[in-house]
């Protein structure tokens, strides 16, 4: 969000375009859609950009169906404070969490960071539930006059990126090609979303032309990776935003 906001600021427009990061690391479409419906709409936004996918993939079907079993871990509570309570979100705020994770080998079950493969058993049903949640929010957007953009994030192994030695080794010990196959099946939920949402963006291939290291685990990316993603989102989203304010 910080990089995206700076790109809009650089346009030097007469009207202020404010990019606000309302996301919380580790959450799924369950929490995100709830917050949009019950909290964030009160701020009367013009546009929501939803960026995610992998946390839903790695959440088991039982928790998708029974939301009461979702627990708020200490990690999530701390991340909520650093990303929502603190006035600004910076990529570096993730550094202590990432470092602690690497050193202690903690496993947050909502994020792919272990050596286990993603469970493929119910992936199409999970994809359908994910799609249905965002379809509902997009329909609410039509009623309340805000736009919705849904973005499927890249993960290590998605697309056709030439991997660095470290990325390749990490991928082989954290699910390998199996995880890519499962993620590609999950991505089928994107197609029906195009019927309800203002725009649907698939970023699985966003790093195809970037052979340098951009991942530091299965889903999180470096500062350079965030810049690449922000540039791609800006190029796609800015025409829509500029048209709305003209």
What function would you assign to each model-found segment?
Residues 1-25, 34-44, 49, 68-69, ...:
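Serine-esterase "nucleophile elbow" of acetyl-processing enzymes
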Residues 2, 6, 30, 34, ...:
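Solvent-exposed, polar/charged alpha-helical surfaces in well-ordered, non-transmembrane soluble domains
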Residues 5, 9, 13, 37-44, ...:
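Sec-exported extracytoplasmic/periplasmic mature domains
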Residues 15-17, 43-48, 142-149, 196-199:
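Loop/turn elements at helix/coil->beta-strand transitions in domains of secreted/extracellular proteins
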Residues 21-23, 152-153, 202-205:
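Residue-level recognition of beta-strand->loop/alpha-helix junctions
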Residues 54-191, 208-212:
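Serine-dependent acyl-ester chemistry module
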Residues 130, 190, 195, 199, ...:
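Histidine-centered active-site loop/cap adjacent to the catalytic His
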Residues 199-211:
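Active-site-adjacent bridging/hinge elements
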């Amino acid at each position: 969000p910080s990089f995206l906001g700076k790109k809009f600021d650089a346009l030097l427009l007469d009207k202020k375009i404010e990019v606000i990061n309302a996301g919380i690391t580790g959450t799924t479409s369950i929490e995100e859609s709830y917050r949009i419906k019950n909290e964030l709409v009160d701020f009367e936004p013009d546009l929501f950009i939803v960026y995610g996918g992998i946390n839903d993939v790695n959440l088991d079907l039982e928790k998708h169906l029974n939301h009461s079993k979702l627990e708020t871990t200490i990690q999530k509570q701390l991340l909520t404070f650093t990303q929502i309570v603190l006035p600004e979100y910076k990529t570096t705020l993730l550094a202590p969490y990432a470092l602690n994770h690497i050193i202690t080998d903690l496993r947050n079950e909502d994020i792919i960071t272990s050596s286990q493969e993603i469970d493929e058993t119910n992936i199409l049903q999970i994809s359908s539930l994910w799609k249905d949640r965002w379809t509902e929010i997009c329909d609410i957007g039509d009623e309340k006059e805000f736009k919705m953009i849904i973005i499927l994030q890249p993960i290590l192994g998605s697309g056709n990126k030439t991997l660095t030695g470290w990325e390749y080794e990490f991928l082989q010990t954290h699910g390998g090609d199996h995880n890519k196959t499962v993620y590609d099946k999950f991505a089928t939920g994107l197609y029906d979303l195009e019927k309800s949402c203002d725009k649907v963006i698939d970023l699985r291939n966003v790093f195809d032309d970037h052979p340098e290291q951009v991942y530091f685990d299965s889903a999180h990316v470096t500062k350079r990776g965030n810049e690449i993603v922000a540039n791609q989102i800006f190029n796609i989203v800015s025409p829509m935003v500029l048209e709305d304010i003209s």
